[in-house]
């Protein structure tokens, strides 16, 4: 089996990274940073997000497992004290694959130049660089509303616990192949109206955001921030690809949510 280990970059994570490499090499596994079968991330959710974006071209062939040394390890199943146990599992135990849905984002330009396709594990946000975002929001080809406000957040089920949750969105189980649209400070008065509620779209529904004024847009894809001019539309839907996690023991989603946000009662 080919593996690689990525680190958050702090001393604790770097030490664990080197320790895991030594252990797995001693077990006869092959270190391969280009085409790994399994990616072990040491840090927090940000470390796993970086690893995901590095290996998006290998999602069908690569599984991820996280060790939590950060402040929030929603995607991490293991803690530093369990490193030796995890290494033995990786070297000797067949693992279960658990798949989570991803978000596909396609940015198209008014000059009909080549479109840009992106994948997000957590969310995509769309904002105007100059004041409020004013755009048509289409669902399945029909105009649903004219949105006016700070911006829109489109999240995956696993990403529903991140920025989406802070916006008052619902937490969705990753077994639901869906995306969620949440508003950022929408303008609602006698003249302008939006739905004012998060929307959950199933796998076969597409959301199309069409700016009504030609301003520069700020688009975030997870931890990346991009600037686009002359945007014709931003299309969001459930991606065909999925992220694959290597599971060596049960870790129920709702238990993960409770431990991340509520703690022990």
Curated annotation (Swiss-Prot):
So where does NAD(+) get bound?
Answer: 45-46, 50, 122-123, 148, 150, 185
Q: Where is the active site?
A: 45
What GO terms fall under cellular component here? cytoplasm
Localization in the cell: Cytoplasm
Q: Which reaction does it catalyse?
A: NAD(+) + ATP = ADP + NADP(+) + H(+)
Q: What is its EC number?
A: 2.7.1.23
What SUPFAM superfamilies does UniProt report for this protein, alphabetically?
NAD kinase/diacylglycerol kinase-like
Gene Ontology biological process terms, A to Z: NAD metabolic process; NADP biosynthetic process
User: Per its UniProt record, what Pfam families does this chain match?
Assistant: NAD_kinase, NAD_kinase_C
Q: What class of enzyme is it?
A: transferase
Q: Give an example GO molecular function.
A: metal ion binding
List cofactor names only.
a divalent metal cation
Source species, domain of life: Bacteria
Main location (coarse class): cytoplasm
Q: Which UniProt keywords apply?
A: ATP-binding, Cytoplasm, Kinase, NAD, NADP, Nucleotide-binding, Transferase
Q: Key word Protein biosynthesis present in the record?
A: no
| NCBIfam families to which the protein is assigned, alphabetical | PRK04885.1
Q: What does this protein do?
A: Involved in the regulation of the intracellular balance of NAD and NADP, and is a key enzyme in the biosynthesis of NADP. Catalyzes specifically the phosphorylation on 2'-hydroxyl of the adenosine moiety of NAD to yield NADP.
- Similarity comment: family membership: Belongs to the NAD kinase family.
Name of the protein in question:
NAD kinase 1
Q: Which organism is it from?
A: Halalkalibacterium halodurans (strain ATCC BAA-125 / DSM 18197 / FERM 7344 / JCM 9153 / C-125) (Bacillus halodurans)
């Amino acid at each position: 089996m080919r593996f690689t280990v990525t680190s958050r970059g702090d001393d604790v994570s770097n030490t664990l990274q080197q320790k895991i490499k030594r252990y797995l090499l001693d077990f006869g596994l092959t270190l391969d940073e280009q085409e790994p079968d399994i990616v072990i991330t040491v840090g927090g959710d940000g470390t796993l997000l970086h690893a995901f974006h590095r290996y998006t071209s290998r999602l069908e062939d690569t599984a991820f497992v996280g060790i939590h040394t950060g402040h929030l390890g929603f995607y991490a199943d293991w803690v530093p004290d369990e490193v030796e146990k995890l290494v033995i599992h990786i070297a000797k135990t067949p693992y279960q694959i658990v798949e989570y849905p991803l978000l596909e984002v396609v940015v198209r330009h008014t000059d009909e130049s080549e479109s840009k396709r992106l994948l997000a594990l957590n969310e995509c946000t769309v904002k105007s660089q100059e004041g409020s975002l004013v755009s048509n929001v289409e669902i399945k080809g029909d105009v649903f509303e004219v949105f006016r406000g700070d911006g829109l957040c489109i999240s995956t089920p696993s990403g529903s616990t991140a920025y989406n949750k802070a916006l008052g969105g619902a937490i969705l189980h990753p077994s639901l192949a869906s995306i969620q649209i949440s508003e950022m400070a929408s303008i609602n008065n006698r003249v302008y109206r939006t739905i004012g509620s998060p929307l959950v779209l199933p796998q076969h529904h597409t959301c199309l955001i069409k700016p009504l004024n030609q301003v520069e847009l700020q688009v975030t894809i997870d931890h990346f921030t991009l600037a686009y001019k002359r945007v014709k539309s931003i299309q969001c839907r459930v991606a065909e690809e999925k992220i694959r996690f290597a599971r060596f023991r049960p870790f129920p989603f709702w238990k993960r949510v409770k431990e991340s946000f509520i703690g022990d009662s």
